[in-house]
Amino acid sequence: MLQALLIFVLQIIYVPILTIRTILLVKNQTRSAAGVGLLEGAIYIVSLGIVFQDLSNWMNIVAYVIGFSTGLLLGGYIENKLAIGYITYQVSLLDRCNELVDELRHSGFGVTVFEGEGINSIRYRLDIVAKRSREKELLEIINKIAPKAFMSSYEIRSFKGGYLTKAMKKRALMKKKDEHAS
């Protein structure tokens, strides 16, 4: 029984680490992923080793499977809380909606406005890049000002230049100034 509990606990530690490592690889953060992979591998070997010692012990196998499933739930929760990376939203509007553009820019979001031809009229598309950690804030602003907007989103693997890069550099400089002032 104690072995089954140990296997379960190891799995709910191992699987979230596996999730984080996978995300780091997808985000092209290979060095961080390799570091996390060391811990992941060690836990995996210990847990699986206990299970393979006695394959007739069904409690250990069940603990492994339930721990894996629970670890997936926990890993998904942790990934959402960490919100690593950036996201782009494309927002389609019937009118230019300067109020929305101004509010997004005032809130620190980079916004590019495009005019295009829809089936019945001119349409406007906003391209908005944001940190994933600010996605909820972004959606609240859009839904408050343009609740009928059509939106689609996708995650960004990498980017270069633009407003967001300038804003990040500016924040880094401000942080250094604050550290030197203290």
Curated annotation (Swiss-Prot):
Keywords assigned: Cell membrane, Membrane, Transmembrane, Transmembrane helix
Cellular component GO terms held in the UniProt record: plasma membrane
Membrane topology field: Multi-pass membrane protein
Major place of residence: membrane
Record-given protein name: UPF0316 protein BCG9842_B1857
Pfam families with a match to the protein in the record: DUF2179 (PF10035), DUF5698 (PF18955)
Sequence similarity: Belongs to the UPF0316 family.
Transmembrane segments: 6-26, 32-52, 58-78
Disulphide connectivity of cysteines: none
